[in-house]
UniProtKB/Swiss-Prot annotation:
The keyword Disulfide bond applies. The active site is at 99, 170. InterPro entries: Deoxyribonuclease-1_AS, DNase_I, DNASE_I_2, Endo/exonu/phosph_ase_sf, Endo/exonuclease/phosphatase. Belongs to the DNase I family. SUPFAM superfamilies: DNase I-like. It comes from Homo sapiens (Human). The keyword Hydrolase applies. Preferentially expressed in the skin and up-regulated during keratinocytes differentiation. Highly abundant (at protein level) in the stratum granulosum. This is Deoxyribonuclease-1-like 2. Keywords: Calcium, Cytoplasm, Disulfide bond, Endonuclease, Hydrolase, Magnesium, Metal-binding, Nuclease, Secreted, Signal. It is an enzyme of class 3 (hydrolase).
Length: 299
């Protein structure tokens, strides 16, 4: 997967569609499983939301046999003119409660190159990141040298196509500070493993209100380092209910990726307003809104 022919096909598809952009979202769909996807109202709206993205992370997937995911993919492919596929993690969690990370992607826009589950040597994460490398249109410029644990042997740089690495996190609320900080260690691990720093960290970080307070940010390396650009501001509200919290975030790094960010495209996707739902109807879908960003690429 992800070879020159696949990349060329993706570029042709983007050219034919009259766009050179990649819309990426992250959606915590509360307790996603068979009952939610089989509900006609919920299932159809979820499918339409995800079909609006070229690449989307879904969290809180509770579907070990992938029956709900299979049904979801059928619904997405029935409402979209493009064909979608998926890649998912194993069920993750420290106790009997498990969740999966799910990436849904448009096959003519990106392809999966490689995946791995972060080993989490310090056991910081309740649900360790399932890291996925996608092939995407390149920006054509060579990136500067990357930081690495192996100071004397910098990792190799991608020679042609840009590889876009997505790192998901659904943080345990009361461990959010430690888990968000530990994403910096994931960043170093990806550089050592794959030799690229073009990464998006995304998901429900629980990064606001009582879980991450203003005084906590200084201890979070992912926030204090200038390497990372936080795209969803602290002032955002990513919750459907009456709270006002910026739980869901997208963080970018890598010179080429940061140059590819479409200005002002990072936003909260208010599906309640989009579909004309009342709060009860919206909460039946999820207690979180998706967050998103668009990457633009040179033709």
């Amino acid at each position: 997967m992800g070879g020159p022919r696949a990349l060329l096909a993706a570029l042709w598809a983007l050219e034919a569609a009259g766009t050179a952009a990649l819309r990426i979202g992250a959606f915590n769909i509360q307790s996603f499983g068979d009952s939610k996807v089989s509900d006609p109202a919920c299932g159809s709206i979820i499918a339409k939301i995800l079909a609006g993205y070229d690449l989307a992370l879904v969290q809180e997937v509770r579907d070990p046999d992938l029956s709900a995911v299979s049904a979801l993919m059928e619904q997405i492919n029935s409402v979209s003119e493009h064909e979608y596929s998926f890649v998912s993690s194993q069920p993750l969690g420290r106790d009997q409660y498990k969740e999966m990370y799910l990436f849904v992607y448009r096959k003519d826009a990106v392809s999966v190159v490689d995946t791995y589950l972060y080993p989490d040597p310090e056991d910081v994460f309740s649900r360790e990141p399932f890291v996925v490398k996608f092939s995407a249109p390149g920006t054509g410029e060579r990136a500067p040298p990357l930081p690495s644990r192996r100071a004397l042997t910098p990792p190799p740089l991608p020679a042609a196509a840009q590889n876009l690495v997505l790192i998901p996190l659904h943080a345990a609320p009361h461990q959010a500070v430690a888990e968000i900080d530990a994403l910096y260690d994931v960043y170093l691990d990806v550089i050592d493993k794959w030799g690229t720093d073009d990464m998006l960290f995304l998901g429900d970080f629980n990064a606001d209100c009582s879980y991450v307070r203003a005084q906590d940010w200084a201890a979070i390396r992912l926030r204090s380092s200038e390497v990372f650009k936080w795209l969803i501001p602290d002032s955002a509200d990513t919750t459907v209910g009456n709270s006002d919290c910026a739980y869901d975030r997208i963080v970018a790094c890598g010179a080429r990726l940061r140059r590819s960010l479409k200005p002002q495209s990072a936003t909260v996707h208010d599906f309640q307003e989009e579909f004309g739902l009342d709060q009860t109807q919206a909460l039946a879908i999820s207690d979180h809104f998706p967050v998103e960003v668009t990457l633009k690429f040179h033709r």
